[in-house]
Amino acid sequence: MQLNFAKYQAAGNDFIIIDNFQDQHYTYSPVLTKQLCHRQFGIGADGIISIEKKAGYDFALLHYNADGSQGRGLCGNGSRSALHYAQVLGIIDQKAYFNAIDGAHIGCIHNELVDLTLQDVNSIQPLASGYFLNNGTRHYVEMVDSIDLIHMEVVGFPKRNMYPFEKEGININFAQLIAPDAIQIRTCECGLDAEPLSCGTGAVASALVASSYYGLNSPVKVSTKGGKLQVTFTRLPDGRFIDIHLVGPVYQSFYGIVHPASLLPIVAYNPL
């Protein structure tokens, strides 16, 4: 069996995009997913996005994490990358109505710039030293003064299983105000063993927290290690957020063909 794929990145958040809409059929396997995403023993990526057929939609997206697990929430940058690839494949033109794990979304493509709508956010709740919200994915956001001083391995990753998310986990974001209309963020995600260069839904979550508690108005510019994103929204008097959009460029790195049977098992480094 051979598997055709496209490699994409959006603000450095990289994905293997698989066309399950047309001829081939990728069957989810935790072991194979982990192998494909491994940066030494596979193609290398933060995750896999599969484009699927679904009645009533232009297409549906399935998301798998680099650790082999299935995504439990919306993947913002992965969805934007898949939107671009769906246009390349001729599945859509410039606009799409598609389904993800959290429900229906609309995406618009203007060359490399891809605009993704997200679900309304009805509340942002204080939690520990930060705030919790769900924008299709659970996020914890903590505002800090010096984001570059954060040691993710020590401070960030352990918080992914903080109370009350010990079992299912939660994505952790640190955000710093850098201008009256801009923030800088870093994220550690469930399903990833290393800090990604960006996280789309994390950018949105951080922008909404900055708006709700620090007065930033739409649009909010978000800087990440991998590039810049923009978040637009309407903030209602009761604190709810509607008409939420994540906007930014996506880039196709390359096409490829992989023969899964030829992949070597992932082995742990064993120094002599």
Predicted features by range, described:
Residues 1-111, 133, 141-272:
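A glycine-rich beta-to-alpha transition motif near the start of alpha/beta enzyme domains, typified by
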